[in-house]
Amino acid sequence: MNLNSIPAFDDNYIWVLNDEAGRCLIVDPGDAEPVLNAIAANNWQPEAIFLTHHHHDHVGGVKELVEKFPQIVVYGPQETQDKGTTQVVKDGETAFVLGHEFSVIATPGHTLGHICYFSKPYLFCGDTLFSGGCGRLFEGTASQMYQSLKKLSALPDDTLVCCAHEYTLSNMKFALSILPHDLSINDYYRKVKELRAKNQITLPVILKNERQINVFLRTEDIDLINVINEETLLQQPEERFAWLRSKKDRF
């Protein structure tokens, strides 16, 4: 299968998987126009849409796409039922698309009903995990998001993390503010800075590398614990995650 990214709005990515026959899966189409343009340019035949959560920048293009291609099956969590979803899926279930089985993973935090889709090596994680960061807590709690990220971090090393936004540079600036001497973070920041200077995408990322540079996945890392302990003593990784998320909200 081929993985494609379609830019939308200011910083969204709509992901598309297509097979050799031209059948395709569309993930979080917040805007129909760039997707329709890509479909026409590549002669794709849309079979399915995956929705991760109910926010408009992830679901806004569904209606128009389904009107154009009524055969499309729209998978999504319960919270997207009024956004065009025709097949509600929940944690532990699977969606069989393009001859591949995608596992549904509940990842509450950004929204209460947020889900991700995984079929090795592809992880479509919406607004749960970003490169160098994680989603804001609009509906869920820090504890929920921490547990959600633990689930995703436990996936295979070679997982391709397909995030829904180009937030990597700002996330790495935050990471440097927390761990300014970390070699992995510094190296990745330089790489991302060069890519963004050329207006190039920083995604997808390999999960093994992401665990090294994403402070939100390093809440049990001794270097991070020492930094946090300089300000406040927090015993549990969930508490350290909440501390980081609060810092990032104000960054």
UniProtKB/Swiss-Prot annotation:
Subunit structure: Monomer.
Consequences of knocking out this gene: Cells lacking this gene show decreased methylglyoxal tolerance. A double deletion mutant lacking both gloB and gloC exhibits almost no resistance to exogenously supplied methylglyoxal, and is unable to grow at MG concentrations as low as 0.1 mM.
Gene3D superfamilies recorded: Ribonuclease Z/Hydroxyacylglutathione hydrolase-like
SUPFAM superfamilies in the cross-refs: Metallo-hydrolase/oxidoreductase (SSF56281)
Keyword Lipoprotein (UniProt): no
Recorded metabolic or biological pathway in which this protein acts: Secondary metabolite metabolism; methylglyoxal degradation; (R)-lactate from methylglyoxal: step 2/2
Cofactor note (record): Binds 2 Zn(2+) ions per subunit. Mn(2+) and Co(2+) can substitute for zinc in reconstitution experiments.
Keyword field: Detoxification, Hydrolase, Metal-binding, Zinc
EC number, as in UniProt: 3.1.2.6
Annotated protein name in UniProt: Hydroxyacylglutathione hydrolase GloB
